[in-house]
């Protein structure tokens, strides 16, 4: 019997998946939007929302484990934590952007909410 694992495997090993999601989360924090596949966008949304919540609560050590970029770390705590101070959750939004020409994969744009 197959049980739900709670996350998408995305065709990658655990360490590769974690590294990819951490890198995508860093890119979203720096650029405030990223274009990727729908499945990856849904997974990285969990990571980014958790990072913003941790930054709002001032838990910087847990954020440092995920964000290796100092500029993204600084922006998260100085800009984004204050921007979303009164917002209880849902810091990202996913827009579907059609199909990718090469492999016909569904593409989405994930953005930080203003």
From Swiss-Prot:
One of its GO terms (molecular function) is structural constituent of ribosome. It comes from the Bacteria. GO terms for biological process: translation. Keywords: Ribonucleoprotein, Ribosomal protein. GO terms for cellular component: large ribosomal subunit. Part of the 50S ribosomal subunit. Contacts protein L32. Belongs to the bacterial ribosomal protein bL17 family. NCBIfam families: L17 (TIGR00059). This is Large ribosomal subunit protein bL17. The gene is rplQ.
């Amino acid at each position: 019997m197959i049980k739900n694992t709670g996350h998408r495997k995305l065709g990658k090993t655990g360490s590769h998946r974690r590294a990819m999601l951490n890198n995508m989360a860093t890119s979203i924090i720096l650029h405030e939007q990223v274009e990727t596949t729908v499945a990856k966008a849904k997974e990285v949304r969990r990571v980014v929302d958790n990072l913003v919540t941790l930054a709002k609560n001032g838990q910087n050590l847990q954020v440092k484990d995920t964000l290796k970029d100092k500029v993204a770390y600084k922006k998260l705590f100085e800009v984004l934590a204050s921007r979303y101070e009164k917002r209880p959750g849902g810091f990202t939004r996913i827009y579907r952007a059609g199909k990718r020409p090469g492999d016909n994969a569904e593409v989405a744009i994930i953005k930080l909410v203003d």
